Regions:
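An amphipathic, aromatic/His-enriched active-site/gating alpha helix that lines ligand/cofactor pockets
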Residues: 58-89
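Short cationic amphipathic helices and targeting signals
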Residues: 52-58
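A structural signal for short, well-ordered beta-strand segments
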Residues: 5-7, 55, 82
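Short connector loops at helix/strand junctions that flank enzyme active sites
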Residues: 49-52, 77
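Short S/T/G/P-rich N-terminal loop/turn motif that feeds into the first structured element of a domain
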Residues: 1-34, 39-41, 46-50, 62-65, ...
Length: 110
């Protein structure tokens, strides 16, 4: 399954990267993801909510939250969020299941 983690760099991390602008965080991220049996798919820098990173990785759904927790526990990032990414086929299957389930539900007001 695919997951996406987004996070903002802390002032401490930005200061460290300013002192060593050639630093490569991808290697550290890849090591963490592969230690959990996953695969790093992509890593991007982000600027929308301040300097940060977006990591897309493949992992077992029981392990992905642990990977996010390790990242969140570092003092280099804040505002860590993880999402499960769904393919178009998965979204269509969810919509179909919703239609089936809707037939068996009636809101309390009815």
């Amino acid at each position: 399954m695919l997951f996406c983690i987004t996070a903002n760099y802390t002032p401490k991390a930005l200061e460290a990267m300013g002192k060593n602008p050639k630093t490569n965080r991808r290697e550290a991220v890849e090591k963490l993801v592969t230690a959990g049996g996953g695969k790093l798919v992509a890593m991007y820098g982000t600027i929308a909510e301040g300097p940060g990173a977006m990591v897309i990785f493949e992992a077992d759904p029981a392990v992905a939250p642990a990977i996010a927790a390790v990242a969140a526990s570092s003092d280099g990032v804040s505002n860590v969020k993880m999402q499960r990414l769904l393919s178009g086929d998965e979204v269509r299957a969810i919509r179909q299941k919703r239609v089936e389930l809707q037939k068996s539900y009636s809101p309390p007001s009815k």
